């Protein structure tokens, strides 16, 4: 059991109907915690909340309260935080996607910067103990191809990256000025069940899985040699709960921490992993699943992304339980079982 989870606390999870948020809500309820969820359904899905309720007992489900609320609504968020009086906030709400931010930078700013500072300010007014918030590996920008270390940043390559970096700065300022404990988690390419495969801004793994399971063609932006540190959702849930529970003396407090696996997978390797596991589950030959088409690299994409997770290990006790292949195997089994 993670330290601090033996006593019941009240947790506010923003983006509760989203991919990561819904997994956090589920694990907190399974641990007997009181959870308040917030989402405006701009990208979150009501289906995810139904899945959470179906995964926990009625007794545990009664510990969950949900509010449809937009974090950009300053007064609304302030009132909700004041009313719920959470001990901890896990802030996952954001408008994700680099391409989306390039198409519509103002909406990304409103959700990721204005919405986040609304949450920070509501938290400090009520006296919330700690805010753990989702940042992104995109803040590293053009730093280079080596393992990314928290204190070395390059130039931001997209409005999305800029919004996440601004959020980190605000969190640290609120820590220094008001004493609000914050921990930022720089996620590296999170994947897992409940990740939406639909729409123009869908992440690569759910999009590819949905297409390949139907033996439809897929595309790689670039020549396939680009690499990412893909991190399974179970690892990310662990990181959030650890960040919420470590002592106030931890070096992670008022800082940012890389959350990945510390290993890279090229996009072509990812394709082969998916093809192999999909073929195994559906009972077909690997070569029956089409090879990907190659398309030009998208604006704002970086060629390589790898997390140095030594600070996460030292400051949080973080230890990834799932490798990329273990996560892919679990994900494919889960997703294709739904359509069997």
How would you label these PLM feature ranges?
Residues 146-155, 203, 293-296, 309:
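Short glycine/proline- and charge-enriched loop/turn segments
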Residues 192-194:
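Short beta-strand->alpha-helix junction loop in the catalytic core
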Residues 166, 170, 174, 204, ...:
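Hydrophobic alpha-helix immediately C-terminal to the catalytic Tyr-X-X-X-Lys motif of short-chain
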Residues 69, 73, 197-201, 263, ...:
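Residue-level signature of the cytosolic catalytic core of signaling kinases
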Residues 1-190, 244, 335, 340:
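N-terminal Rossmann-like NAD(P)+-binding domain of SDR-like oxidoreductases, especially those catalyzing
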Residues 10, 212-340:
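C-terminal substrate-binding subdomain of Rossmann-fold SDR/epimerase-dehydratase oxidoreductases
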Residues 152, 156-163, 187, 197, ...:
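The catalytic Tyr-centered alpha-helix of NAD(P)H-dependent dehydrogenases
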